[in-house]
């Protein structure tokens, strides 16, 4: 049994039974083909145990087991925890817990989850704040999957972690693949920790301040936005060098652009300002931003209110 599974094998089930699917915000994946596809994506990565967040009735769990993957299945509903324990007597460690509070543990692993649509953003923030997972395969709302993968424009949350993570959109999942049927389709999103980060971990705080400044700064287009913080000649030279349209928006930048822009800020001696303040750079003075999620790669996320699992 793997370390991550041994660590949580004895979970308490004394918590009273909570409500049904609606109360937990659950839409269970019932399409076996999609479950198999998720297991295939995980199997194609490095060999690590799998932590499944919100195992529900075990549809994805079953596909992971069929792919010979060691699984720790986390579920909030005690009734479903007991059902999972009966169904998977061997090969799966079933844990009762909340995915927004669960300690992932200091062991290399992959993460799989059909994320309850109502807690997608909190879960992504928490996930980015955990250090030891390698690949996360998540089933989220279709539009969220597209935005996080930078299709049609990148969100601030993705840009804030892009130098350290890669985001890939795998495929669209019809809403009829869920029970009960939600109002929107889902999408399989893969997040992988970069083996060679574009920036050092020590840059996290200042880099995230930069991302916030650029996304929320005044001006129309990147040229105008960046000139509020950098000399015009430096801005023009950077735009030409990176082949970025001066009228482009922050959402149009790619991971390499963001890393290059951060280096430019450091080179010209301008430190991105924490929330609402403008300060000059001091050698070695970097720290995690307290206002922009994720909160950094070196520390965990803030405590979250208790919400349901899903599968």
Swiss-Prot record:
Its EC number is 2.1.1.-. It comes from the Bacteria. It holds the Pfam family RrnaAD. S-adenosyl-L-methionine binds at residues 27, 29, 54, 75, 98. Residues 272-311 are annotated as: Disordered. GO terms for molecular function: RNA binding; rRNA (adenine-N6,N6-)-dimethyltransferase activity. One of its GO terms (cellular component) is cytosol. One of its GO terms (biological process) is response to antibiotic. InterPro entries: KsgA/Erm, rRNA_Ade_Mease_Trfase_CS, rRNA_Ade_methylase_Trfase_N, SAM-dependent_MTases_sf. Residues 293-302 have a biased composition (Low complexity). Keywords: Antibiotic resistance, Methyltransferase, RNA-binding, S-adenosyl-L-methionine, Transferase. Belongs to the class I-like SAM-binding methyltransferase superfamily. rRNA adenine N(6)-methyltransferase family. Confers resistance to macrolide, lincosamide and streptogramin B antibiotics. This is Mycinamicin-resistance protein MyrB. It comes from Micromonospora griseorubida.
